Design a protein with these regions (language model features):
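Catalytic alpha/beta core domains of metabolic enzymes, predominantly
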Residues: 2-90, 96-98
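Active-site beta->alpha loop and helix N-cap motifs at the rims of alpha/beta catalytic domains
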Residues: 1, 126-128
Length: 129
């Protein structure tokens, strides 16, 4: 596939075995200069371990140090650190599942940290309150 204006493709996250299969299948059809990036923060580890070069993260914007530490642990092959960081982030991933995605959760977390007003989302969206 010739994609001269495309530098990266964002793919939805999948569990580890399917992520590896999906990345391998896509790689067969893409120029080597096109990167693959995983979306869905809870799937970052599976996607990066499967060969994605990027993680399109919502939590990385609010929690950059933790997100960077996770990427570095994955990239270095530090299984114990990767597992520990995923365990620390598990409550956030569960909130994303519980509230139907990351937007309201991250907006509420940002408000709790004093980074925005508690009522900062545009209507009809509501904070978790």
């Amino acid at each position: 596939a010739a994609l001269p204006a495309i530098a990266s493709i964002k793919i939805p996250g999948l569990p580890a075995p399917q992520a590896s299969e999906r990345v391998a299948a896509l790689r067969q059809h893409l120029p080597s200069r096109v990167t693959l990036g995983v979306s869905g923060d809870a799937w970052a580890t599976a996607g990066l371990q499967a060969g994605c070069e990027a993680w399109y993260s919502v939590c990385g914007g609010l929690f950059p140090r933790c997100s960077l530490a996770l990427v570095r642990a994955i990239r270095s092959g530090d299984v114990a650190q990767t597992a520990a960081l995923n365990e620390q982030l598990a409550p956030l991933w569960r909130c994303f599942d519980r509230y139907g995605g990351s937007l309201r959760v991250i907006a509420s977390a940002a408000a709790m940290l004093g980074l925005c007003d508690p009522d900062s989302l545009p209507r009809p969206l509501l904070s978790l309150g």
